[in-house]
């Protein structure tokens, strides 16, 4: 029998157990200090590569009391300075740097501390996967149903994956879904972040559509080698049940982007985004006042006005 993630040292020490335990409906607290916040990381980590970069950086905020959720995406080229014990760099290397300092969980811990310092959002848990892990999760769910507003066409050389999708509803397998969330050919980082948020909702939809809640413990154990997390099985089931009870209008999306929150620039020969952390800290707290998730994850005002990149 496969060992559950609960037995892993990665699961034994939540990033902020005391903080999560003290969550309460206190109107004096900022909204994202009243939520359970999960850092979701997706990297290009491979066995043959000594280092890696993080392509997916999202914060999933769950307000368990009010029945709302928010998804905040951070582009990978956001410049971070300072980074404790390291030179300033893009945010997409911080997971790697943290693991060099403290193997088996130091990366999410370092990134969580930087997010809290710069954005004022406490991180309680993390979920981290690489390319193979992502494909295994999607295939274990039986694929994901995604409706496109605009065509997506790309070839990912490093993974030898070609994708060409028309603006209709598709069922994507793990390999296709990986290309969908990694492609930057249409719309760059901003559109890629929106597609990644759509995949979060597609996972929820697939679990509900196939009535897979009873299979969560088996999936949790089977994905032991593909996904690292500090979320225990009991909490995982609780969070899945919470997600299944959400309606589209209960979920709000926020993608950090230019020109107000991020400004393009160069540092050390790298193309970067310079963040206005003061404005970001203020704006992310308004996430539950923003339009529903799927409205902010469409390209145009409505289907008749879609403007594709």
Feature map (PLM): residue ranges:
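Non-catalytic, solvent-exposed segments at the cell envelope interface
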Residues: 1-309
